Amino acid sequence: MRNRNGGVFVRSIAGDFMNGYEFQVYNRCHDGDVNRPVFWATGAIDDRQNARRLVSRDNEWFRMTIVANGPHLASWVNGVQVTDWIDDRKPNVNPRNGLRVEPGVIQLQAHDPATEVEFRRIVIQK
């Protein structure tokens, strides 16, 4: 399958649909250049920081590591760090509107009903 589009939401508000920091799962880049990923490429923090490069490919399992430590959020794909971001916005219970350091739920997303995204071997550490 091509154009798989999904995400992993962290620090989401319990009971609120997909409302947290979203780490993207989308294997696209400009003109086939992995050093020019689209803004929402795999590992990117949606609407906050683009992935530095595209490391993963469609139809291949990959490992994504997400760290959320205070205002610091970062991600690695197959061991390559692709984001490193400090949320310096004013605190807000809603992470779409400001810094949220409170724990929340983790949500897995397939972008729409036609999207097929699979997750396996999920490990959560505190």
Q: Which residues are covered by each model-predicted region?
A:
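Carbohydrate-interacting regions of secretory-pathway proteins
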Residues: 1-126
